[in-house]
Amino acid sequence: MNLHEYQAKQLFARYGLPAPTGYACTTPREAEEAASKIGAGPWVVKCQVHAGGRGKAGGVKVVNSKEDIRAFAENWLGKRLVTYQTDASGQPVNQILVEAATDIDKELYLGAVVDRGTRRVVFMASTEGGVEIEKVAEETPHLIHKMALDPLTGPQPYQGRELAFKLGLTGKQVGQFTKIFMGLATLFLERDLALVEINPLVVTKQGDLVCLDGKLTADGNALFRQSDLREMRDPSQEDSREAHAAQWELNYVALEGNIGCMVNGAGLAMGTMDIVKLSGGQPANFLDVGGGATKERVTEAFKIILSDDAVKAVFVNIFGGIVRCDLIADGIIGAVAEVGVNVPVVVRLEGNNAELGARKLADSGLNIIAATSLSDAAQRVVAAAEGK
């Protein structure tokens, strides 16, 4: 789950990380009042969306008057910001962050992720701040310095000092960086984060370190014990179908094809998309209904898949292990009848009571095609999507 920049900076403040004074505003009037609270300009105004590349898209601007702040807010609030990280429709701008401008001398990068290879939280620091870290990793990987946290001892001040020296910091900056490192590591661990980035972490012309931007991603599997982070969720920034799926504990990711896929099990779902591609089709989504493929969940899954106007056929691929295939077939028949599916549905059942399930599908009288194998199902659904 992603957080907005202003939410990230609220958390930074709780953990003692320095950031510019700022306020999130939902109206042009609030934006003007925020400037008065901050004090004399210049100010920086930023559209709050879950995407990078805001500056290049006009979503970040340095302004010198309250009139300019109002004009920026009037121009963006209620609109959609399109960046290289969004789709063509962009993401809605519901808040504007107004904060004090900072005199920048140097831009650095500091971030942390969970490294699955080492099974550790790994910090990354670089002198190449203000640009995408992926670009730095590709073009100048030697400029990225890494530091893994020991899960037994946690973050240690000496690790912060070591990174500070590698970044060329001196004097009081070493102490400031170490404090930021320790605070960020504590935030990462206590809040069950999956990713945190300060890009850029700037050195001001006065020689102080300031967190100029912030990006946080919380581990969705840990939100049950992070109630305050759950309340920060902004559904408006999510794909509506993905948000609907999350309510039913369905794992859904929208893609750009025309064949809807409904599968039980993430591995089987990925394999299903592969064989659809191999057969000449284009998957419209990844959807894992999980082990509990009940009629209710299958019904909601159909609703989600069919809300995509690009879908021309649906491929249901179910392996019956603990759950019997005849019961799954009953759920599919009930869901198709209830939702009113008007595109071909190809179903492949394998496992416990698969033959009985296939007979039920064939006798249902609905627009359901029972396939005999995985390859047969893939070929049938690709042909159906092409209108053959």
Curated annotation (Swiss-Prot):
It comes from the Bacteria. Keywords: ATP-binding, Ligase, Magnesium, Metal-binding, Nucleotide-binding, Tricarboxylic acid cycle. Residues 9-244 form the ATP-grasp domain. Pathway: Carbohydrate metabolism; tricarboxylic acid cycle; succinate from succinyl-CoA (ligase route): step 1/1. GO terms for biological process: succinyl-CoA metabolic process; tricarboxylic acid cycle. Its cofactor is Mg(2+). It catalyses: succinate + ATP + CoA = succinyl-CoA + ADP + phosphate; GTP + succinate + CoA = succinyl-CoA + GDP + phosphate. Mg(2+) binds at N199, D213. The keyword Protease does not apply. Substrate binds at N264, G321, I322, V323. One of its GO terms (molecular function) is succinate-CoA ligase (ADP-forming) activity. InterPro entries: ATP-grasp, ATP-grasp_succ-CoA_synth-type, ATP_grasp_subdomain_1, Succ-CoA_synthase_bsu_CS, SUCC_ACL_C, Succ_CoA_ligase-like_bsu, Succinyl-CoA_synth-like. ATP binds at K46, G53, R54, G55, E99, T102, E107. Belongs to the succinate/malate CoA ligase beta subunit family. Succinyl-CoA synthetase functions in the citric acid cycle (TCA), coupling the hydrolysis of succinyl-CoA to the synthesis of either ATP or GTP and thus represents the only step of substrate-level phosphorylation in the TCA. The beta subunit provides nucleotide specificity of the enzyme and binds the substrate succinate, while the binding sites for coenzyme A and phosphate are found in the alpha subunit. Heterotetramer of two alpha and two beta subunits. This is Succinate--CoA ligase [ADP-forming] subunit beta. It comes from Erwinia tasmaniensis (strain DSM 17950 / CFBP 7177 / CIP 109463 / NCPPB 4357 / Et1/99).
